[in-house]
């Protein structure tokens, strides 16, 4: 029932439904034929804004985590952090490790201080199941972790060198180190109207950052601002300005406070490094 990659959320695992969902009833309950709650209506696929028979609901297992966080007084939902980069298992990879079909999530890289590394996961491992629940792809793994509460451990079934092994992974949140230090840029510059935060494991996960290990993240862009006009996007990582590295929000704030005849800006977007030059 669940569909991923809808582009609606960072934890984009939804129940797809043909129930009519319109702006007025989003947030309502999605129930089965026995009146059991299975999800909360969240979004529709529509160009007109009205229902066209393709709707999406947040699965009830994820809703439970949000409710528990609210009851405990939390200001945000903290989800378990794996500390690993994952990729889809291709047919060629599946054949090479003895799988009869492409399933699971391949470990491509790891944070040396993350839960994956602590548990003994290695590059090239394929995560096949979480607590006995089969994993089809990286998005499926994200969903399984997203329904877990912080604290304790979860059991991974891993394929390594043609053999299955069990590993216990700690359920801990992504650390926010360095601190977020949110700054909104109002100085005349290509970034005017953008809100930036420091890059950390927590903000990288929150804004779906891929590949970047240094820089600051664009968290928000005001409509009709200079940053919007220049097509900067939420989740872009600003790595350097005029070949000077940007390590923190304060670095960027100081840089835009100076006059420049031109702006050579290098960003990371979706794992790709892009460089653009703008007039001063």
Q: What is each stretch, according to the model?
A:
Residues 29-30, 156:
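Short beta-strand scaffold segments in enzyme catalytic cores
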Residues 37, 62-280:
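C-terminal recognition in membrane/secretory proteostasis and scaffolding
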Residues 2-27, 33-70, 74-79, 138, ...:
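Active-site loop architecture of trypsin-fold serine endopeptidases
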């Amino acid at each position: 029932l669940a569909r991923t990659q809808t582009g609606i959320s960072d934890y984009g695992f939804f129940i797809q439904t043909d129930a009519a969902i319109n702006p007025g009833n989003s947030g309502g309950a999605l129930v089965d034929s026995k009146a059991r709650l299975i999800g909360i209506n969240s979004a529709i696929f529509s160009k007109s804004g009205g229902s066209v028979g393709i709707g999406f609901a947040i699965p009830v297992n994820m809703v439970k985590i949000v409710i528990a966080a609210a009851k405990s007084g939390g200001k945000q939902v903290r989800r378990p952090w794996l500390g690993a980069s994952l990729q889809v298992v291709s047919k060629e990879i599946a054949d090479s490790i003895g799988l009869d079909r492409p399933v699971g999530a391949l470990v491509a890289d790891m944070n040396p201080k993350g839960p994956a590394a602590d548990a003994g996961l290695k590059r090239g491992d394929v995560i096949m199941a979480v607590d006995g629940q089969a994993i089809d792809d990286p998005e499926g793994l994200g969903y399984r972790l997203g329904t877990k509460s912080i604290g304790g451990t979860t059991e991974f079934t891993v394929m390594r060198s043609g053999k299955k092994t069990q590993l216990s992974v700690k359920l801990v949140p992504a650390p926010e180190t360095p601190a977020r230090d949110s700054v909104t840029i109002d100085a005349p510059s290509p970034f005017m109207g953008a809100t930036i935060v420091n890059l950390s494991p927590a903000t990288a996960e929150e804004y779906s950052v891929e590949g970047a290990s240094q820089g600051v993240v664009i968290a928000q862009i005001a409509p009709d601002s200079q940053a919007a006009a220049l097509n900067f996007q939420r989740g872009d990582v600003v790595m350097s300005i005029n070949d000077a590295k940007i390590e923190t929000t304060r670095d960027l704030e100081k840089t835009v406070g100076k006059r420049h005849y031109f702006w050579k800006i290098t960003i990371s977007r979706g794992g790709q490094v892009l460089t653009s030059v703008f007039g001063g």
